A protein has these predicted regions:
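Gly/Trp-centered helix-boundary motif
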Residues: 1-109, 113, 135
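Generic hydrophobic transmembrane alpha-helix motif, especially the helices
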Residues: 72, 103-110, 116-170
Length: 170
């Protein structure tokens, strides 16, 4: 048997023996499935203003409206289903995380590789910038950047990129 296949089978045997790891993997794939297929899984579209009924505002969890739709987590002040809002919010969160992570990886890898290639004063300068940035708490720095730029998904992506690139450059 190929040593790589043997190693992979050994890993899977050890992994599948750990019940917590299997449960975490199942939850991960469930969240990923819900995020990717939210329009098909969610009961309603929270962004579709024609389906939102103000008469259904602030319903408690498990309530039904006049048409018989059950709101398992209730509704918000505008009458939107909270389960649907969570499912659609997962899509946005997953997109922000993946996109900002990939862009930060690209920028950080560029500066890290270029610093290693050119050496000397350029490497010292880039690594001091990285050291200065890594000396601040990431969440605090991201909140300061968002406070300076304003709120919004695009500003959040920019803040995450500006905070994360240094980890990849190091």
């Amino acid at each position: 048997m190929n040593p790589k296949i043997k190693k992979a089978l050994s890993f899977w045997r050890d992994f599948s023996a750990n019940k917590i790891a299997v449960a975490a993997l199942a939850i991960f794939f469930l969240v990923l499935f819900v995020a990717l297929f939210a329009p098909f899984v969610a009961p309603t579209n929270p962004y579709d203003l024609t389906s939102v009924d103000i008469m259904n505002s602030r319903l408690s969890p498990g309530s039904e409206d006049f048409s018989g739709i059950t709101f398992w987590l209730g509704t918000d002040g505008a009458g939107r289903d909270m389960v649907s809002a969570i499912f659609y919010g997962l899509r946005v969160s997953l997109g922000v995380g993946v996109f900002s992570g990939l862009v930060a990886l690209t920028i950080g890898a560029f500066f890290g590789i270029s610093a290693a290639f050119f050496r000397g004063k350029y490497e010292t300068f880039v690594m001091r910038i990285v050291d200065i940035q890594l000396s601040f708490p990431s969440i605090l720095l991201a909140l300061i950047i968002i406070a300076a730029f304003g709120k919004g998904v695009d500003k959040t992506i920019i803040a995450l990129i500006l905070v994360q690139w240094a980890y990849y450059a190091r």
